[in-house]
Regions:
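Membrane-proximal first intracellular loop
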Residues: 2-109, 113, 121-125, 131-141
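Intrinsically disordered, low-complexity terminal tails of fungal membrane proteins
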Residues: 1-18, 201-224, 285-336
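Residues within membrane-spanning alpha-helices of integral membrane proteins
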Residues: 43-49, 53, 68-75, 102, ...
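Juxtamembrane membrane-water interface segments of multi-pass membrane proteins
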Residues: 56-65, 90-94, 123-136, 196-228, ...
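Extracellular loop 3-seventh transmembrane helix
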Residues: 98-110, 154, 171-189, 225-285
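Cytoplasm-facing ends of alpha-helical transmembrane segments in multi-pass membrane proteins
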Residues: 50-57, 106-132, 148-162, 186-204, ...
Length: 336
C-alpha cells in the first residue's frame, strides 16, 4: 500500500475522503489551514474580485485592450482562490478546497504584473522611443517572458507544497520553490520600477524643455497620462508589498505565526490585491487614454504636446538635425 493510501487510512473516518465537508474540529487533527477560514472574508473578496472580473472582462471585449485582458485573468484567478477559501470555511478539512486556494492565490499577482508591463509598453509607444531606454517591443518581450517564468516556478512550488501538506509530508522543497518564484518576481519588478521611473523622468524632461523655449501648449504632459501612471505605481507598490509579505510568511514555515493567523493574509494579500486590481477601475487606462486619444493620432500633434521642445533643443545643438522625426513616430503609433 502506498504512502498516500497509508496516510488516508490513518485519518478519522469523517475526513478520510478528499471531498469531505467535515467542519467540526477533530481532536489531534489540525485544520489544513491551521485555522478555520473566515466565511465573511471569503464572501467579501468573492464579491470584490467578481466585480473587477466583470468590469475588466467587459472592457477587454469592448475596447480590445490587452491590459484589460490581463487584469481579467488576474481578477479571475484571485476569485477562484477566494472561492476555495470560502469553501474551506465550510469544509476546513477538504483537500481539494485547500489545494485550490493555495495554487491560485500564489500565482494571481503574476497576471496583474503582466498588465503593468503591457501598460507601460503601450505608453512608450504613445510617447515615442525617446521616452524609454528600451523599445516598446523589447520591453514587452523581456518582462512578459520573466512573468511566465515566475508563473511556472510559483505554480510548481505551490502544487508541491500543497501535495506535501495534504499527506503530512515535508513541504520545504515546495515552499522554497514558491519563495524562489516570488523573489524572482520581486527582482523583475525592481527593474521594471526603475524603468518606469526613468520613463516618467524622460517625459517630464521633454515637457520642461518645451516650456523653456516658450511652447506653452507643448510644455505639459496631459494629466490623464499622469493618472494612468499613478494607477500603475499604486498597483506596483501593492504587489511588491504583498510579495514581501508572502516571502516572510513562507520563510517562517507552515506553522509560523503569519501562516497560522488569517488576519495577516486578509490584510497583506487579499486587500492589497483588491487595491492592485481596483485602482484600474477608478483610474482606468482604456477610458482615460481612449477619451484623449485624439491628442496622439497625428505625428504633428505628438510633437506639439511632448516632443517639440526636445527636438528644437537638439536641432539647435546639432545644426538643425533632430534625433527623432515625424516619420519614425508615425510608424510607432501605427503599432499601438
Amino acid at each position: 500500500m502506498g504512502s498516500k493510501a497509508d496516510f488516508l487510512a490513518s485519518l478519522p473516518e469523517q475526513i478520510r475522503s478528499p471531498n469531505n465537508c467535515w467542519a467540526e474540529k477533530l481532536p489531534g487533527v489540525p485544520y489544513n489551514y491551521g485555522y478555520r477560514p473566515s466565511l465573511a472574508a471569503g464572501a467579501s473578496f468573492i464579491v470584490l474580485f467578481a466585480f473587477a472580473l466583470i468590469y475588466h472582462l467587459t472592457l477587454s471585449m469592448r475596447k480590445k485592450r490587452w491590459v484589460s485582458v490581463a487584469l481579467s485573468y488576474g481578477a479571475f484567478v484571485e476569485l477562484i482562490g477566494w472561492v476555495g477559501r470560502t469553501w474551506g470555511s465550510q469544509c476546513p478539512y477538504n483537500q481539494h478546497a485547500y489545494l485550490m486556494q493555495i495554487v491560485t492565490l500564489i500565482i494571481g499577482p503574476v497576471f496583474v504584473t503582466a498588465a503593468l508591463y503591457i501598460l507601460l509598453g503601450q505608453l512608450i509607444q504613445i510617447f515615442g522611443p525617446e521616452s524609454s531606454m528600451l523599445s516598446s517591443r523589447m520591453y514587452t518581450i523581456i518582462f512578459l517572458t520573466c512573468d511566465w517564468v515566475t508563473l511556472i516556478i510559483q505554480a510548481i512550488g505551490a502544487a508541491m507544497a500543497a501535495s506535501a501538506q495534504r499527506t503530512r509530508k515535508n513541504p520545504t522543497p515546495g515552499t522554497n520553490t514558491m519563495i524562489a518564484g516570488i523573489v524572482f518576481q520581486l527582482a523583475t519588478m525592481a527593474v521594471f520600477a526603475g524603468l518606469a521611473v526613468d520613463f516618467l523622468r524622460r517625459i517630464s524632461k521633454s515637457a520642461s524643455s518645451a516650456r523653456s523655449i516658450g511652447d506653452v501648449d507643448g510644455g505639459s504632459v496631459p494629466k490623464q497620462y499622469y493618472s494612468v501612471l499613478t494607477a500603475l505605481f499604486i498597483s506596483l507598490v501593492c504587489i511588491v508589498a504583498r510579495n514581501l509579505f508572502r516571502v516572510v510568511e513562507l520563510a517562517e514555515g507552515w506553522t509560523g505565526h503569519l501562516m497560522l493567523h488569517e488576519r495577516y493574509f486578509v490584510a497583506l494579500d487579499g486587500l492589497l490585491m483588491v487595491l492592485a486590481v481596483w485602482i484600474f477601475i477608478v483610474l482606468d487606462p482604456a477610458r482615460l487614454v481612449d477619451e484623449n486619444r485624439d491628442l496622439f493620432t497625428r505625428p504633428a500633434d505628438v510633437e506639439r504636446v511632448i516632443h517639440k521642445g526636445s527636438l528644437e533643443v537638439e536641432e539647435a545643438e546639432h545644426g538643425g538635425r533632430g534625433s527623432y522625426g515625424a516619420k519614425e513616430y508615425s510608424a510607432s503609433q501605427q503599432a499601438y
